[in-house]
Every structure is written in C-alpha cells, then in structure tokens.
Amino acid sequence: MSVLTAAEIMTLIPNRYPILFMDRVDELNPGESITCTKNVTINEEFFQGHFPGNPVMPGVLIIESLAQAASILILKSEQFQGETAYLGAIKQAKFRKVVRPGDVLSLYVEMVKQRSNMGTVKCTASVGEKVACSADLTFIVAAADDKI
C-alpha cells in the first residue's frame, strides 16, 4: 500500500509526463527519509534513442528520479509546504548497475542536513538488492512563483 499515489505526488511537485519519474511513495518519515518506486517500462520516451536495440535508462534521469523523491521529502516538511524544491548540486554520484525496461527502481532518500531554505540529502536508487546509483544532492527551497 502506498503512502502517496501518483495523483497525490503531482499535487506536491511540478513535474509531469514525460518528466515525472515516480509512481508512488511507499514510505515517508517527514524530515527524515522517503522510499519511492518507479516502474521502468519500455514505453518511456527516452528509450527510443537511449539506446536503440539496447534500452538503458540514462543516469541523469536516475538522478532526476532521486531529486523528485527528495523534493517530496522536503515539501512534506511543515515549514516548506506550498513551496518548490530546486536541485542545487550533485556530489559523489556513482552509477553501478544498468537500469532497463521491466526493472522496478526503488528510490531511497535520507535527510542529512537542513537549514532555513537549503539542505543536503543522501540518495540511493536500487533494482532489487543491487544499487544502481548513489549520490548526495543539495537543494534550495523557494516560493513556487519565485524566479530563482
């Protein structure tokens, strides 16, 4: 059973098809951690060109999936409700496993540091028991209508 459905996710973050990379939130501990699921299907638009005959999810889109999960974690904190989280930096990104159509990508994000309008999270994307990607992300939070 999910904590948040895709429809509920879309009330929190501005991403939409074809750039919404999350199907559900499975576990949420506001201000601490979040676990989400992305079902990777052959119908994803990026598979048309990455790579024909050998479809692989681009690493940058795995990072984007983690950033979207981080956004939900951040925006579910009382102090940031109604605002938007923006990716500010990517550090220590490592790619260890190829993600292919049919894989279920499990996204885990843990809050490391948070102060005023910015913070850092530690992220892991896994397929089964194997880590596909890990990274530390820094975010900035601003009003949804701010031009930053």
UniProtKB/Swiss-Prot annotation:
Places the protein is found: Cytoplasm
Organism: Levilactobacillus brevis (strain ATCC 367 / BCRC 12310 / CIP 105137 / JCM 1170 / LMG 11437 / NCIMB 947 / NCTC 947) (Lactobacillus brevis)
GO molecular function terms noted in the UniProt entry: (3R)-hydroxyacyl-[acyl-carrier-protein] dehydratase activity
A Gene Ontology term for the protein's cellular component: cytoplasm
Keyword Isomerase set for record: no
Database matches in SUPFAM superfamilies: Thioesterase/thiol ester dehydrase-isomerase
Active-site residues, as the UniProt record annotates them: H50
InterPro entries for the chain: FabA_FabZ (IPR013114), FabZ (IPR010084), HotDog_dom_sf (IPR029069)
Reactions catalysed, as given in the entry: a (3R)-hydroxyacyl-[ACP] = a (2E)-enoyl-[ACP] + H2O
GO-annotated biological processes: fatty acid biosynthetic process; lipid A biosynthetic process
EC number assigned by the record: 4.2.1.59
Main location as per UniProt: cytoplasm
The name this protein goes by in its record: 3-hydroxyacyl-[acyl-carrier-protein] dehydratase FabZ
